[in-house]
Amino acid sequence: MASQIDQYAVFGNPINHSKSPFIHTLFARQTQQSMIYTAQCVPVDGFTEAAKHFFAQGGRGCNVTVPFKEEAYRFADRLTERARLAGAVNTLKKLDDGEILGDNTDGEGLVQDLLAQQVLLKGATILLIGAGGAARGVLKPLLDQQPASITVTNRTFAKAEQLAELVAAYGEVKAQAFEQLKQSYDVIINSTSASLDGELPAIDPVIFSSRSVCYDMMYGKGYTVFNQWARQHGCAQAIDGLGMLVGQAAESFMLWRGLRPGTKQILRELRKNLEGAL
């Protein structure tokens, strides 16, 4: 790339609605970093070629979103521990020796958002709904917060069992089928994308209590259907995934630039945009 300005991007398909360029442009302005961040829509079979070209042309780093996170994992020359455990990469960085480092900042983004919302994770009982890539990416960061217990539940019980076994070296995680859930939890995290389709998991609402904090990784205008359901059953607090989006972006920015940007103002701006106030 001819420009002297450092180049960053997000790769995905579709990518039109990505908020990453908005977020990282504000991060750069806030921290007085000279950089350009663009959105790149890549053919579903063209990620590796596009990423190679981007870095060959001087690109410094990129984010990776659906459906390329697993391919980015294979593309990276080196992996952080959290990326290796997640089995997926959402952040790539070109190192001084020319190799590409793969990282996964999703779990840290979730934890930082929960802590920013004054959610107590240490000593908490946590229920994680879903056993896909999103769940896999957040388990170790959650275990690092020393909860009393983490239970993974999934429509297909075998997947929950596999995920619990995968992280066993980092801490005990229980696996339960939906129909086995017969108690309430302090923190309930929905890692599935069901809310985007207006669907709810087939789980007994006994999981909710007046002390429960409920977190849906999806977000939209107003409450997600999962958070509406949680509120109807008396949960103390219902949070969507917009703060996780900003948190994982801040962690990526830190990896690239060595500076941790503030997130509160940017989260407020995004929320205004989402609610149609701007």
Swiss-Prot record:
Binding site for shikimate: 18-20, 65, 90, 106, 223, 248
Cysteine pairs bridged by disulfides in the record: none
Keyword Hydrolase: no
Gene Ontology biological process: amino acid biosynthetic process; aromatic amino acid family biosynthetic process; chorismate biosynthetic process; shikimate metabolic process
Enzyme class: oxidoreductase
Catalyzed reaction equations: shikimate + NADP(+) = 3-dehydroshikimate + NADPH + H(+)
Active-site residues, Swiss-Prot/TrEMBL: 69
Gene Ontology MF: a single term: shikimate 3-dehydrogenase (NADP+) activity
E.C. number: 1.1.1.25
Function noted in UniProt: Involved in the biosynthesis of the chorismate, which leads to the biosynthesis of aromatic amino acids. Catalyzes the reversible NADPH linked reduction of 3-dehydroshikimate (DHSA) to yield shikimate (SA).
Protein name: Shikimate dehydrogenase (NADP(+))
Protein source organism: Vibrio cholerae serotype O1 (strain ATCC 39315 / El Tor Inaba N16961)
